[in-house]
Amino acid sequence: MSTNASDSPVLSLLIPIYNVQRYLRECLDSAVAQTLEDIEIICINDGSTDSSPDIIREYMERDARVKMIDKANSGYGDSMNRGLEMARGEYVGILESDDFMAPDALEKLVSAAESCNADFAKANFDFYWSKPEERRSLHEMFKPKDCGKPVHPSDTTQFFKQKPSIWSAVYRRDFLERNGIKFLPTPGASFQDTSFAFKVIACADKAVYLHDAV
């Protein structure tokens, strides 16, 4: 596994963080273990008052790909926009700090986007329970007939009706920048993922969906 930082990585993975010490190590473990190694992992610490910043620094010492934006609390939208400003990758991915991803998640998503020359690639995902016993359940937003081929997402309303799940996708950074797609910076604003996902679908010329959960 490569732990070296690249000046122009394939993908920038944004992780917004606020008081998630309980879950953060599992999240970061899944990020640094990605089979797509040419990534930068941008941790945006939104004024955490627990041990989250110390955990981030611990991973920064072990892996040069891990970086931190350490700032006063300003909310999810501003945090994500700060991450987008720092991103240098050809693609942008998002990982919520209380979540984790399959080891090959980013590799699958980027490969699909590349093969279809898509503005974004998006996959199904699993619901996960750790108690009373570990189990997973596929949330099938996209049926096999809709997957693995380029589509124009705004041609049908079905894709606007799916869960936003902005973290089960990768986006071409130049596509986001050309279309001015950002998050609402207003502190406390709700449904940030919904507005971001809507703008992505409305602006994209081409997308590809994956049936596999990531």
Language model features with spans:
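Nucleotide-sugar donor-binding/catalytic module of glycosyltransferases
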Residues: 1-214
